[in-house]
Amino acid sequence: MKYLPNLVVASLATLLLASCGNGDSTVSMEVRLTYNDAPYAVGETVYKGDTAVKFEKFYFYLSDLQIGDQLVEEVMFCNAEDSTTMNYEWSLENKANSFFFCVGVDSLNNAMDPTSFDVGHPLSSANDMYWSWATKYRFLRIDGRSNPSGTLGTDDILLAWHTGKDELYRCVDLTSQLAGAIKGGDHLILEFELDQFIQNMSLETESMTHAMADDYDIAVKLSNQLPGAFNLRVE
């Protein structure tokens, strides 16, 4: 019986350690389109100066998303009209002080055959983001229209920004936007700020690119806008 107190103490210590180790390690993230700091829904009309703009399709790839030293997602297909592709959850191994990702598909995955993936895979041909064996995946697929008169109508300027090719892969480091460590239980909001993305684009003369020779400079300009078009908030 003289060993009973020690046994009780040991049992309590074990329970205490177990309870301390059962904290929530889940981190969730929403990818959100915004325009002038307000959430943007595909099909909504917004304004760049006096020009009316409407995005009607908005698809893009994010790759190599790292929170701290942990690679949480190799590739993500984001369809702004499908919330299941804009919301994610991961189990975070440790607190993290950095956040990094790239826009597009890295060169290894860009060389893959899309028909080799299951329908639910981000790189599946079902997502209709693959051009051909020569040009490979589209990194961005943005379709819409604009009108400098301020009213959309029959004389709209069509917008088609389709970029791809390995050299247009762009990476984004948002570590400097973190006020503190990312930890289990946090909800991250990754904002794609469309007003920042299009601010240096001419909606009249730079409205079309398929990353081909005759419009490649527009694809490069769009791609170079990407690192400054994302914002990270932690809730």
Predicted features along the sequence, with ranges:
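Hydrophobic helical h-region of N-terminal Sec-dependent signal peptides
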Residues: V9-A13
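A short, solvent-exposed, low-complexity linear motif enriched for acidic/polar residues
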Residues: G21-E235
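C-terminal motif of bacterial Sec signal peptides marking the signal peptidase cleavage site
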Residues: L17-S19
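Bacterial N-terminal signal peptides that target proteins for export
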Residues: M1-V8
